[in-house]
């Protein structure tokens, strides 16, 4: 007993000392631009890194432990005042204590944190060689033609996926240039880890290319920069954005860092460019840490169930309806929102079709920014030709998750990969969320999609007036 009593003041003394030490960590506040970058590994691992670049161009890597309610997009590419721990004895990312957005009125975020993208978005590929690696894995024409408008090339791809909302006309590539350092000068252990010095790679790759490219593009700056390296980086290919001043233009440049395996498959390039456009991962719903488990989205399993091209390898698929809506690629009159109690009978057409007569997606709000989405996928178009099948696909969306959209799987437990019958809702099948009193029933197949009934509220409330035996055609909603 005596020994136990002695341990209590000792423990309290330790806790007080630790608390005092934590409280004594110096804090620093810096104003600059926040950018996030995703790392994508072929082994299924993913990483997300945050950087704050101040007005003098100095970049600080941050440790972000909690995202805002609207998810990463609320901070990404935004000007902010960030307070972080600045312990001189510790190296590595700085732990964030507070973030306050500034110049909020100048950004184009919508209420859900998304940012519309439209028009021509030219990119430039800069090809950078480590000083100790002489190989040039592909020639200049390979990278220049990658941006073409033939099937399998990126201008054609982004036009189809966005329904013509964006293109990459004006994109180009410049010939291989030499970096001033060897591979290990940027990556401590090439091919492993997640600690490539992305800032140094960006700074020295763009500097090496600067004599040969005008990043300001004659007053119409390039939208993004694809950096193509001639050796592996760390674990990953990386995509996101990076604030910098290049040729007099200061902005968050949409940016990718690509090892050779990244540009051998155009689907990987499309995935990383998608991060550049502000898209996170989507996922299946098995609860593991691997976000590459959905073959329905280029932002998940980028090259699974993909079409192959003789030159550009495995191509990207379409992204999911929620992501297209985030970027404002689906017109409001092609989105049905089931936000009231009752039955909503809706005809939904295949998401990959260039034009549709009916709706492209259904939204079912759950409160806040959380919702279900309903879309139809089929083996159609130039890039969805090998998806697992023709079906209604339902996602649960929460922007506060790292992978915001998760495919609903009717099987329990959920499959490890979302290519099973459990995720493909077909005629006669019903998804039910009893807690929110929501059902989604697939009623029938149409020429271009499916007729779906969304029911909100309990059946007792819905049919309290006894009209269920009458004509319900007034509750239907389709377009002609």
Predicted regions and their residues:
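Bacterial N-terminal signal peptides that target proteins for export
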Residues: 2-10
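Bacterial N-terminal signal peptides
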Residues: 9-19
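Structural detector for short beta-strands of small beta-barrel domains
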Residues: 24-46
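OB-fold (S1/OB) nucleic-acid-binding surfaces
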Residues: 42-63
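Extracellular hydrolytic enzyme modules, especially secreted metalloproteases
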Residues: 219, 223-383
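Non-catalytic C-terminal accessory/binding modules of secreted extracellular proteins
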Residues: 64-70, 241-263, 336-460
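Zn2+-dependent metallopeptidase catalytic core
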Residues: 69-79, 85-92, 100-270, 350, ...
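Extracellular carbohydrate-recognition regions
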Residues: 460-479
